[in-house]
């Protein structure tokens, strides 16, 4: 008998997944193997996400659905679109990127969302919600116009479906009647709890049994399937709920879109059976699947909000790596909760970002002065306008990247009448791992272009509080912009007095003066440390500028350096140049900011270094301007 081998490799925990590097490999598996493959995908997703900062719960919930879609459709010929794209980790693994999953959201690695330039299997570049249906319609129209015959399937979550863009696209889809499959992935949650009438309708579908009631058109639609879907309940497992198409009660059918569901989104074999029969039907079809966010991971199923995008954790126990950090979002949430006790006119509105914007406690303490409008940034802003017209002091809590979606409402509904609306703009500047779709580097530029809108960049939590208090006491719209990241906590009751449009000197020096606010001010102070003759000004107001201090420093200094965590096109540096021109001053100015190009995912520090706005880069510029400075910081 031979001796046992001492170094036998342990059996793979993912034997089926190890055989799948493409959708064609997937199709070689038997249908009875698909549940095991989905389980292996989930195990791999948990392992990948345990390093922190990745979208865990949504990817676990969508795994069975993604397996079924790729088993039936032929990507990349057929187009599979994912709304938002953060649930598509299984899609990435099934399309040849499993070996790169450890690079997700890392510099030079895979995107955390789908991205056209990353893979031929990624139909759209995405990161914002509610865009998939309009994209799918465009692809279906292009297919028909060019006489082609590929299939189009869009996966959209119930949270994304609350967005006006998705509903408007659905209305047009029903009107045009082009062949496409819309998979409504109903996990009862986006990042925050879903709200609105459409959400209530879908919740009702899950607790009531609806049946086809005899409309002739509905019967024909059912009979178009090889096995009548009218018999679906008798042949499907108990997890498959029901089918109906009564236009009188179903808003999807009322729009002209065939509706099937709700069905169990974790019965992968049943999903395959349905998709095979629905994807070739004439006209648009919605397949409503009910999934569990965090599926297969008990602690993620129990708290999907916490596990939407967790930090580092132990996959076996779910224990997180502890953090005592205090975020800018938390600083805002604490400040506005206290402010609402002081001023009964305070009312906070957010577009589906309660947790991310630090508003959980506020929503609990002041539930009657809090509104989540869902993924509807335009509605949030115009609702605030209506409140301001009636004497309230609304605060719109919103990420910078999402405020872009409400530019017209800021201009048309708020600014023209100079209404008292405060915009608490979180994630201003580079956000890092989420990349180009989420970087908030355009807000200073587009808000500067709107008359009446003031813009503030607090340097710390105290200044944030001072700006919030000022906004509640003075007239006109005011945008307070702060970065992603951590800040030092300040005591409750801290409300420093701020004078409108004023800057402050933080370091004396009249040879070269650095003007910066917000996150960029940290770099400016570090760069100028122990450099005689180099001044630093906290340019905490981007609009209006402090004309008096600007004239003073520009008259004395050999040169000015502006630093901003915003695009150089039309931002703070541009504002300074415009002001100097109006003042008739010719002081040389070096404008440092984010280049006129989209910035891919990387750490915030890496992007800032690449953009040339971190402390070493500023010191290099100072040296070029003749300052005697060592380049090491």
From Swiss-Prot:
GO cellular component, one term: cytosol
This protein's record includes keyword Magnesium: yes
Record-linked CDD domains: TPP_DXS, TPP_PYR_DXS_TK_like
Biased composition (Polar residues): 1-12
A Pfam family matched in the record: DXP_synthase_N
Entry cofactors: Mg(2+); thiamine diphosphate
Keywords of this entry: Isoprene biosynthesis, Magnesium, Metal-binding, Thiamine biosynthesis, Thiamine pyrophosphate, Transferase
Keyword Thylakoid: no
Example of a GO MF term: thiamine pyrophosphate binding
Residues involved in Mg(2+) binding: 158, 187
Domain of life: Bacteria
Matching SMART domains: Transket_pyr
GO biological process annotation, one example: 1-deoxy-D-xylulose 5-phosphate biosynthetic process
Free-text comment on the cofactor: Binds 1 Mg(2+) ion per subunit.
Residues the entry annotates as binding thiamine diphosphate: 86, 127-129, 159-160, 187, 377
Reactions catalysed: D-glyceraldehyde 3-phosphate + pyruvate + H(+) = 1-deoxy-D-xylulose 5-phosphate + CO2
Pathway(s) served: Metabolic intermediate biosynthesis; 1-deoxy-D-xylulose 5-phosphate biosynthesis; 1-deoxy-D-xylulose 5-phosphate from D-glyceraldehyde 3-phosphate and pyruvate: step 1/1
Coiled coil residues, start to end: none
Region of interest called Disordered, as start-end residue ranges on this chain: 1-21
Listed EC numbers: 2.2.1.7
PROSITE patterns assigned: TRANSKETOLASE_2 (PS00802)
Role noted for this protein: Catalyzes the acyloin condensation reaction between C atoms 2 and 3 of pyruvate and glyceraldehyde 3-phosphate to yield 1-deoxy-D-xylulose-5-phosphate (DXP).
Similarity annotation: Belongs to the transketolase family. DXPS subfamily.
Subunit structure and binding partners: Homodimer.
UniProt name for this protein: 1-deoxy-D-xylulose-5-phosphate synthase
Species, as recorded: Deinococcus geothermalis (strain DSM 11300 / CIP 105573 / AG-3a)
């Amino acid at each position: 008998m031979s001796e046992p081998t001492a170094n036998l490799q342990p059996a793979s925990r993912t034997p089926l997944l190890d055989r799948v590097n493409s959708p064609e490999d997937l199709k070689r598996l038997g249908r009875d193997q698909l549940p095991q493959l989905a389980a292996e995908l989930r195990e791999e997703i948990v392992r990948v996400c345990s390093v922190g900062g990745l979208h865990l719960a949504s990817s676990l919930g969508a795994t069975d659905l993604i397996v079924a879609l790729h088993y039936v459709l032929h990507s990349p010929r057929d187009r599979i679109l994912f709304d938002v794209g953060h649930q598509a980790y299984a899609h990435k693994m099934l399309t040849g990127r499993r070996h790169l999953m450890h690079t997700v959201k890392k510099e030079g690695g895979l995107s955390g969302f789908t991205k056209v330039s990353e893979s031929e299997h990624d139909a759209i570049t995405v990161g914002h919600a509610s865009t998939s249906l309009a994209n799918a319609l465009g692809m279906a129209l292009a297919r028909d116009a060019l006489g082609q015959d590929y299939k189009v399937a869009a996966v959209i979550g119930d949270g994304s479906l609350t967005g006006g863009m998705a509903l408007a696209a659905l209305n047009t889809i029903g009107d045009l009647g082009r062949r496409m499959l819309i998979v409504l992935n109903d996990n009862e949650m986006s990042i925050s709890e879903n709200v609105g009438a459409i959400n209530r309708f879908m919740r009702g579908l899950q607790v009531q049994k609806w049946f086809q009631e005899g409309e002739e058109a509905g019967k024909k639609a059912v009979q178009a399937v090889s096995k009548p879907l009218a018999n679906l309940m008798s042949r499907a497992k108990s997890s498959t709920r029901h089918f109906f198409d009564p236009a009188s009660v179903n808003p999807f059918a009322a729009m002209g879109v065939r509706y099937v569901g709700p069905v169990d989104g974790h019965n992968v074999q049943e999903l395959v059976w349905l998709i095979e029969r629905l994807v070739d039907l004439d006209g648009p079809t919605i397949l409503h699947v009910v999934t569990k966010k965090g599926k297969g991971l008990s602690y993620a199923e129990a708290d999907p909000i916490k596990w939407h995008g967790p930090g580092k954790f132990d996959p076996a126990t779910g224990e997180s790596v502890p953090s005592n950090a205090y975020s800018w979002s938390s600083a805002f949430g604490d400040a506005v909760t206290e402010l609402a006790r002081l001023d009964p006119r305070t009312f906070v509105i957010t577009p589906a970002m309660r947790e991310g914007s630090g508003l959980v406690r506020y929503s609990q303490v002041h539930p009657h002065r809090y509104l989540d409008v869902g993924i509807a940034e335009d509605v949030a802003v115009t609702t605030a306008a209506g409140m301001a017209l009636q004497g309230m002091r609304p605060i719109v809590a919103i990420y910078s990247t999402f405020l872009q979606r409400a530019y017209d409402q800021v201009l048309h509904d708020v600014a023209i009448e100079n209404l008292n609306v405060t915009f608490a703009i979180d994630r201003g500047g580079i956000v890092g791992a989420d990349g180009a779709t989420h970087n908030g580097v355009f807000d200073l530029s587009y808000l500067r272009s709107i008359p009446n809108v003031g813009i503030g960049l607090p340097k710390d939590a105290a200044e944030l509080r001072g700006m919030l208090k000022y906004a509640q006491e003075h007239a006109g719209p005011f945008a307070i912009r702060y970065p992603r990241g951590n800040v030092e906590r300040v005591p409750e009751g801290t409300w420093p007095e701020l004078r409108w449009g004023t800057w402050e000197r933080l370091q004396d020096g009249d040879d070269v003066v650095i003007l910066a606010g917000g996150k960029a001010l940290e770099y400016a102070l570090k760069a100028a440390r122990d450099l005689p003759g180099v001044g630093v000004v906290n340019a905490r107001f981007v609009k209006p500028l402090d004309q008096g201090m600007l004239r003073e420093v520009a008259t004395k200094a050999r040169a000015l350096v502006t630093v901003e965590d915003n695009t150089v096109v039309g931002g703070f540096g541009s504002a300074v140049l415009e002001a100097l021109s109006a003042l008739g001053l010719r002081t040389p100015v070096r404008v440092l900011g984010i280049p006129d190009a989209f910035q891919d995912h990387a750490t915030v520090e890496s992007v800032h270094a690449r953009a040339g706005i971190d402390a070493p880069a500023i010191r290099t510029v100072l040296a070029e301007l003749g300052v005697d400075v060592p380049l090491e910081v």
